[in-house]
Amino acid sequence: MKSRDEIISLLRRYKPTAQEKYGISKLGIFGSVARGEQTPDSEIDVCYEGLAPSFLTLDMIQSELEQLLGSKVDLVRVRDNMNSLLRQRILRDGIYV
């Protein structure tokens, strides 16, 4: 697994593409990678803000991120009406690029 700094750097480079292609306004990581507690088997938790994509588009974004980061990605859209515990974790641990 790549380091937290490598993941952040890769996401920074990907963000302009995500903004243009998918309407993503904010992109970041949260969870074990953001806290520096990841293991070789950890998924990379990626959060984003922006337009709500279709399931097909969401799958495309996830595939692009998994290829870019070389790991399984769990992709979560941050919004007001989401699970409050998950939202709190993202707000607490999240690192936006």
Question: What label would you give each PLM region?
Answer:
Residues 1-26, 34-40, 50-97:
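Catalytic core of pol beta-like nucleotidyltransferases
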Residues 45-48:
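Short beta-strand->loop micro-motif that forms the acidic, two-metal-ion catalytic signature
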Residues 29:
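Conserved histidines in hydrophobic membrane contexts and catalytic metal-binding motifs
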